[in-house]
Curated annotation (Swiss-Prot):
Pathway: tRNA modification; archaeosine-tRNA biosynthesis. Belongs to the archaeosine tRNA-ribosyltransferase family. This is tRNA-guanine(15) transglycosylase. Exchanges the guanine residue with 7-cyano-7-deazaguanine (preQ0) at position 15 in the dihydrouridine loop (D-loop) of archaeal tRNAs. It comes from the Archaea. PANTHER family: QUEUINE TRNA-RIBOSYLTRANSFERASE. It catalyses: guanosine(15) in tRNA + 7-cyano-7-deazaguanine = 7-cyano-7-carbaguanosine(15) in tRNA + guanine. One of its GO terms (biological process) is tRNA wobble guanine modification. Keywords: Glycosyltransferase, Metal-binding, Transferase, tRNA processing, Zinc. Its EC number is 2.4.2.48. Binds 1 zinc ion per subunit. The gene is tgtA. The keyword Zinc applies.
């Protein structure tokens, strides 16, 4: 099957998206708990009953057992495990890391994963620790590339399974780049990023950030990113915010064996707990004293179940934070419970500001909460300060995060939606022409001249509504974020001021008429786009002669859209210059 990956919503660098597999559609970000058939603490059937939609298991462990191998080939992996959700399989790469070798070739394990019906499979790459020597790392990279090339030569034979390609290289950035570039050329379905062993065990999150961001900057943005080995719920929000779409780990079980009780903020020792600070089914029906008195096997199973419930709850919260556009707030909250995670957050915001900003939505429906020094470095805050240079009005108000802000931006995100205890209420009201001129200059990163517009306000709340200029309605302001939504007349006015290709998406001639009649602008329709377009930007769609076709809202970034599937939506049309065709338009994904 071909890759179907569609972004529905963005926040930070996270994507609420749909991934179709032959066993069903996953909503990402998602956590894949590891199931070890040799140590079945919680069975896949029990996981399914807990609400888990996807799991990962080690195909090498199944392959190595004659009994399991025969059953998997005969019945399929889903039947063998008793799980009808999405099953991802690892290739045995972790065994290479732990033991130095596996008793199977890359081609054998690829064919085996395909034959047992894995939804998502992986090549035999070579995971590395942060303490590996340069020479050994080079050898591992060469082996990973050879195995990736072997997969590419077998692509047709292995169709109908989604395949993960994972670059390696450890802490040697040049090796990571070399491996990533080759993996990109081979065009896997799913991008993999291997967490750096040892460093992760030492809570060295900075090393993980640098490794992930190096790979993310090279691999195609239009594919999902799987971050191997990330399993503590306290880190899900953070790693989703930097662009990871899925995670896997056996930590829920390994921690349970050690008597460790997961929370969204860290880990507690069962021996030190007097009351369970959780209302999951396990904690609601047992108390710590009772669990401590159980046998090791019973205790481990209950703790593992609790740890899984917490992991499920947290990944749901991450998805909800993306929907509500408050993911950075969740990241900031979680990072304050571990100094290494907070240090990694500050490192991320300082070092990768441009890469983060390129995917950050321009507007959000949720307010921005200033909670510490990291708030000054958030990508939307840095962008907002940078865009103020396009505005030349004397009236100002002061904001801690932004400095002096033109009064005309009083109601625009993020200035009017920032919650900071040191900011005073702004009493002054901007003039109508001040609002429209400042907002357009900010929105389109271009200094507009003074526009003598007239505003219509809500009689009950005073909220800005319609905007008129010379007797024509040119647009309206969206109440929750103050963004200007142009009409077709407004779009024509904006085009008359903006230099080409500012604010525009240019559609190829073949697709001009269908877009002019209201069809979504798909990636394959686009000839050129303003690279400063961000998710939720208000965009003007034109033909190759720079004639207005439509207005709409961006789903993707202007610097990443071309890396997505040709059928992925880029601009959702709001208004169009021609009536919709009487014929039924082609079915599109909006």
């Amino acid at each position: 099957m071909g890759l179907y990956f569609r972004v529905r919503k963005s926040d930070a660098s996270a994507r609420l998206s749909e991934l179709k597999t032959k066993s069903g559609t996953l909503i990402l970000p998602e956590f894949f708990p590891v199931y070890n058939p040799n140590k079945p603490v919680i069975t896949p059937r029990e996981m399914s009953e807990m609400g888990i939609k996807a799991i990962i298991t080690n195909s090498y462990l199944i392959y190595r057992s004659p009994e399991l191998r025969e059953a998997a080939i005969e019945r399929g992996i889903h039947s063998l495990l008793g799980f009808d959700g999405v099953v991802m399989t690892d290739s045995g790469a972790y065994q290479i890391y732990r033991y130095g070798r596996v008793d199977v070739t890359n081609s054998e394990i690829l064919r085996f994963q395909h034959s047992i019906g894995s939804d998502i499979g992986s090549i035999l790459d070579v995971p590395m620790s942060s303490e590996i020597g340069r020479e050994e790392a080079e050898s591992g990279v060469e082996r990973t590339i050879r195995n990736a090339e072997e997969w590419a030569s077998m692509r047709e034979e292995l169709s109908n399974t989604l395949w993960v390609g994972t670059p390696q290289g450890s802490i040697y950035r040049d090796l990571v780049i070399k491996c990533s570039e080759r993996i990109r050329e081979l065009d896997f379905d799913y991008n993999g990023v291997g967490s750096i062993k040892v460093a992760l065990e030492k809570y060295d999150f900075v090393t993980q950030v640098d490794h992930f961001m190096s790979i993310r900057s090279i691999l195609r943005a239009g594919k999902p990113f799987h971050f191997w080995g990330i399993g503590h719920p306290s880190t899900f929000a953070f790693f989703a915010a930097i662009g990871a779409d899925s995670f896997d780990s056996a930590s829920y079980s390994l921690y349970a064996e050690q008597g460790r009780y997961m929370t969204p903020h860290g880990t507690l020792l069962l021996d030190e707990i007097e009351e369970f600070p959780c209302s999951c089914p396990v904690c609601s029906s047992h108390d710590p004293k009772e669990v401590k008195a159980m046998s090791k096997e019973e205790r481990t199973k209950l703790l593992a179940k609790h740890n899984l419930y917490i992991s499920i709850s947290e990944i749901k919260k991450v998805r909800e934070a993306i929907r509500g556009e408050w993911l950075w707030e969740l990241v900031q909250e979680r990072s304050r419970f571990h100094p290494n995670l907070y240090f990694a957050l500050m490192h991320l915001l300082r070092r990768y500001s441009s890469l983060l900003e390129a995917r950050e939505p321009l507007f959000k429906s949720s307010g921005l909460q200033c909670s510490g020094p990291e708030s000054f470095l958030r990508p939307e805050v840095v962008r907002a300060r940078n865009r103020l240079k396009y505005i030349h009005y004397n009236g100002k108000f002061r904001r801690v995060l932004y400095g002096d802000v033109p009064l005309g931006l009083k109601y625009l995100y993020p200035f009017g939606q920032t919650i900071c205890p040191y900011d005073e209420e702004v009493q002054d009201e901007p003039e109508d022409d001040e609002i429209i001129t400042c907002v357009l200059s900010y929105q389109y990163e271009f200094p507009f001249p003074k526009l003598p517009a007239i505003m219509r306000r809500s009689k009950s709340t005073g909220t800005l509504r319609e905007v008129s200029l010379e007797g024509k309605v040119i647009g309206h302001f969206r109440p929750n974020d103050g963004a200007f939504i142009p009409t077709l007349d407004g779009a024509s006015l904006i085009l008359s001021h903006l230099p080409y290709p500012k604010g525009r998406v240019v559609v190829k001639g073949l697709f001009s008429d269908t877009v002019a009649r209201g069809t979504t602008v798909f990636v394959k329709f686009v000839k050129e786009a303003d690279p400063s377009i961000r998710p939720k930007s208000e965009v003007i769609v034109v033909n190759e002669s720079d004639e207005l076709l439509a207005t709409g809202k961006a789903v993707l970034s202007g610097v990443e859209y071309h890396q997505y599937h040709p059928d992925h939506p880029f601009i959702i049309i709001r208004r169009h210059v021609k009536p919709r065709s009487e014929e039924k338009p082609p079915e599109v994904d909006s």
